[in-house]
């Protein structure tokens, strides 16, 4: 059993195509991000998402752990249901993604072939030539909007032939 506060319940029940959450510290934005990630990777097997953060280091040390702890609470186990930062080993017998990443270093991969790429804004071009199915953007107040618009929004265009009927396909969750 998991407790959600009123603001979290409101956002989780809305489940909009595009959602923006501007909230103070301690609201529990990680649960909102984790729920969106779960909806997208489970309902779009083999999909490729993007998790945008100011820097990879900040994402891996501060942001991602608060999101992944919710997946753990919901029964998803690291190195069984998802793998962070490396290619899943063959003995897991996972499905393959529709588009296999060339580099697994900044990815979260899931048992059904879905992959979520950590997209860093500390270098330009980190989302160039990607075809993404959804975006989760954290720490929006630190995100360079021009870079986001010119690089990452353009990449949120993938796999229309597979997922066009899923309402969250090409959706965005923005938190700050």
Question: Predicted regions span which residues?
Answer:
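Phosphate/NTP-binding elements of NTP-utilizing enzymes
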Residues: 1-176
């Amino acid at each position: 059993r998991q407790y959600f506060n009123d603001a979290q319940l409101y956002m989780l029940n809305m489940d909009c195509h595009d959602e923006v959450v501007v909230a103070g510290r301690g609201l529990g934005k990680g649960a909102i991000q984790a729920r969106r990630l779960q909806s997208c990777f489970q309902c779009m097997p083999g999909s490729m998402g993007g998790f945008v953060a100011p820097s990879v280091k900040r994402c891996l040390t501060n942001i991602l752990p608060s999101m992944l702890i919710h997946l753990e609470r919901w029964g998803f186990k690291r190195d069984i249901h998802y793998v962070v930062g490396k290619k899943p080993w063959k003995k897991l017998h996972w499905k393959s993604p529709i588009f296999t990443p060339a580099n697994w270093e900044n990815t979260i991969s899931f048992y059904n072939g879905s992959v979520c790429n950590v997209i860093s804004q500390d270098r330009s071009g980190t989302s160039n030539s990607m075809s993404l199915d959804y975006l989760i953007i954290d720490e929006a107040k630190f995100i360079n909007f021009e870079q986001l618009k010119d690089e990452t929004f353009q990449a949120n265009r993938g796999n229309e032939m597979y997922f066009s009927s899923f309402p969250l396909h090409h959706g965005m969750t923005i938190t700050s």
